[in-house]
Each structure stands twice: as structure tokens, then as C-alpha cells.
Amino acid sequence: MVTIRADEISNIIRERIEQYNREVTIVNTGTVLQVGDGIARIYGLDEVMAGELVEFEEGTIGIALNLESNNVGVVLMGDGLMIQEGSSVKATGKIAQIPVSEAYLGRVINALANPIDGRGKIAASESRLIESPAPGIISRRSVYEPLQTGLIAIDSMIPIGRGQRELIIGDRQTGKTAVATDTILNQQGQNVICVYVAIGQKASSVAQVVTSLQERGAMEYTIVVAETADSPATLQYLAPYTGAALAEYFMYREQHTLIIYDDLSKQAQAYRQMSLLLRRPPGREAYPGDVFYLHSRLLERAAKLSSQLGEGSMTALPIVETQAGDVSAYIPTNVISITDGQIFLSADLFNSGIRPAINVGISVSRVGSAAQIKAMKQVAGKLKLELAQFAELEAFAQFSSDLDKATQNQLARGQRLRELLKQSQSAPLTVEEQIMTIYTGTNGYLDGLEIGQVRKFLVQLRTYLKTNKPQFQEIISSTKTLTPEAESLLKEGIQEQLERFLLQEKV
């Protein structure tokens, strides 16, 4: 017979009590009052932070944007079709952040940094806040290194430096994306990480850009962040910040980055949609009052870091679409005032066959000239002046038929210079090639050719100089200056090729 000993039982009970550990987790919860149009109104969530992520019962994530006295306005990061009135919502205690790593290079992702190219997960051990504060004044230094776009018109007259913010602005179908993608292609071998953010674009357009970059081997150093036109407004609004967070990751690791936002008009429209649905008061053009801050806090993250922080840089090329060339609309004027210059693309120039359709007269770069190499400065000054005089003369020449010889010569020179600025898409030129092209035009070597022969001659000249005068390129790339020796080599090469070309044309 088993004897029951009271002390044993009391010991067992004591052990069990000591081992018992009741974990209490406090969850900040609320209830869905209303849901629809990508917006949910929540009752409860008393201690939620502005911008905090909240999780719905069925798994959808949202961001708390409006904190009102009796409810919280949440924007949804998904379609939210399964969310029901009365279902519960819990605050996560986190602000929106994304994983970051080198493994993102060559991938296409969405605004939440999830891959959408069907190539599996992306390994990442670190994460960054989507909304990070911009570097302060002490953390920056002035722009001094060039970021070459490969387009003669930009690199000579509207130069861009590493760490600059240069707006690309123009009507639809004027080649804004082409200028941006050509700039990405030209970074090959330059040790620059590129991030292309597509906001509210057609999926077919994004696929076209990705294919173009893949074919030319540019995806190796590029990340594409895409939220197409059918994405929820919340994700279209977040996409540029996600792109900026990825670019910042590389910038703070002492690397140079280039980020393209294509385009910020669509981001502003997505933000307007969210704000109006949240019943925030509308302002000019029905945009909310803080739409300027929407873009300024994004573009201020582009910087050239100081030497203490490793001299990394983030160059931003935001794109803004205008309606019928109206740059005095709300979003264009806002972004023009935030950026360090703008490149205007004109529909009239585009339709008249001048591509890239850059209106050099009203495009400016406010800090880039400090970043130009000396050799480019030596040849570009004359080009700017001659084109400005040509534009003025051309306007007068329309009204007068009898022009003196000097004016006729100046008009002929101007037409050839304009021809020299034309470039095919996806055919960026090196700085050395640009310098030889501009030098040929501004020193009158093209004056004897027909306008139709100019481009053909320049293509042959570049090939001829590359094979027969390689020292020219070596001098420019090593000294960054057009030395007397380089100039004499260039003159010889142009003269020799010009004679050969004229003989060919006669035959």
C-alpha cells in the first residue's frame, strides 16, 4: 500500500508554484469602424504613434496617418478586401522599415522591398527606416565631382555633380525617362550604384526599362523599385522613400549612388488621394497643405557626405510631368524650388527631331559647374555662348530675308552645333568623345559640311581618333585638361579625317 507523505506533496506544489511564470503582454488594440477606398477608420488604438504600422486581423498592414480625438485614420498597404467592420486591429510598435543589403543589386522590388521579379527571396541582415532624417549641414560637403550622363547637351551646358538634385521636367512623351535611363547606362564601370523608382507607371513601361538595362548589362549595379498604376495609393506614396533608403544604405558605406524618381507628379497624386479620403483639408489644386514637405524631405536626403562620413554621395534626378508646358503649376514650382537646377524637355523640340529635346536656354544647373572637369570647361564655354547667340539670331532671321555674310555664317554654325547635340537613345558618349565633338563644332571644322553630313562625320571622327590618336584620350583622362599637346593631336586628327571624309563623299 502506497503511503502519502504530506511533506512530499507540499514540496511538489511549491516547486510547481515557483516554476509558474505568467507572461503578460500588453497589446494596443482597436476596432474597425469603417473601411473602403484604401482607408480604414479605427476606434481605440489609444497609444498609437503617427506613422506607426498597425496589423489587421486578416494580416493586412496599414500606417496610422490621422490621429483624431475619436478615431484613427489608417491607410492600407494592400487591397484590404478581407477586412470587416468590427474586426480587431493591433499596433505593432514599429515604424515602416525595409531590409537592406548588397543582394538587392540587379533585382526588381516593390515599395515594401519584396522581390517582384520571380527570382526568389533576397537575403538581408540589416534594415533601415523608410523615412530617415536627411544628413545635417555638418555632415555634408559641397558638390565637386562630376556625374557624367553621357549626353553632350547636359554634360557640357547643364552639368550634374555627385550629390546634386537635378529635376528633369517636361510634358509626357518628351523623353524624360530616356534621359534618366541613359544616365544609368553611362554609370557602367564608374562604381556608381543606381536606383530607379517607377511610381504609378504602366507595368509594360517598367518592363521595357528593365529589359533595356538588362540587355546592356546595367542591371548588375541597379535596383528597380516599382509600384505600377494598379498599386494601392499608399504603396505609390511610399515607393520613393523605399528607393531613398536603399540608396542611403550604399551612400553611408562610402559609395556613390544615383537615384531616379519617375515620376514625382504621380506620387503627389497618390498622396492627394490618400489625404482627401482621410478628409484632410485640400489646398491649391486640391493637394494637401504638406505636399511641399512630402517632396522636400525626400529630396533633402540626396547629399555629398563629408570626409568624416566617408565621402559617399547620393545624386537625385526627380522627374516631373507638366501639362502643355505649364511649369507654373503647383508640383513643378515646388520641386523646382527644392532642387539644384532643372533640365527642361520641350515637346516642340522633340517633334522637330531634336533629341534629346533639351531646351538649353531655360535649363540650369545651380551647382554642377563646380563639378565639371577643366577640359570640358575649356570647350563648353564657347558652345554655350554660340548657341545662345544663334537662338537670338534665328528669331530675328525669320523676319528678314537679306542677311549679311557674317550673320549667315553664324546661323550656319549654330545649325551645325545644334546637330552636334543630337544623340540616339542608349548611346551615351564618354567625356573624351564629348570634348572632341564640341571642339570640332566650335572651332568651325563642321562649317564646310552639309547639315545632313555632320552626324555621319562625327561618328567616323570618334572611331578614327580612338584608333589613330589614342594618346589624346590618355592625356584627357589622366590630366583632365585639354593640354596644348592634346589640342594639337586633336587638330591633326580632325584635319586628317575631314580630308578623308570629303574624298569619300565626292566618290
Swiss-Prot record:
The keyword Kinase does not apply. The modification Phosphothreonine is found at T257. Its EC number is 7.1.2.2. It catalyses: ATP + H2O + 4 H(+)(in) = ADP + phosphate + 5 H(+)(out). This is ATP synthase subunit alpha, chloroplastic. InterPro entries: ATP_synth_asu-like_sf, ATP_synth_asu_C, ATP_synth_asu_C_sf, ATP_synth_F1_a_nt-bd_dom, ATP_synth_F1_asu, ATPase_a/bsu_AS, ATPase_F1/V1/A1_a/bsu_N, ATPase_F1/V1/A1_a/bsu_N_sf. CDD domains: ATP-synt_F1_alpha_C (cd18113), ATP-synt_F1_alpha_N (cd18116), F1-ATPase_alpha_CD (cd01132). F-type ATPases have 2 components, CF(1) - the catalytic core - and CF(0) - the membrane proton channel. CF(1) has five subunits: alpha(3), beta(3), gamma(1), delta(1), epsilon(1). CF(0) has four main subunits: a, b, b' and c. ATP binds at G170, D171, R172, Q173, T174, G175, K176, T177. The record marks S363 as: Required for activity. GO terms for cellular component: chloroplast thylakoid membrane; proton-transporting ATP synthase complex. Belongs to the ATPase alpha/beta chains family. It is found in: Plastid, Chloroplast thylakoid membrane. It comes from the Eukaryota.
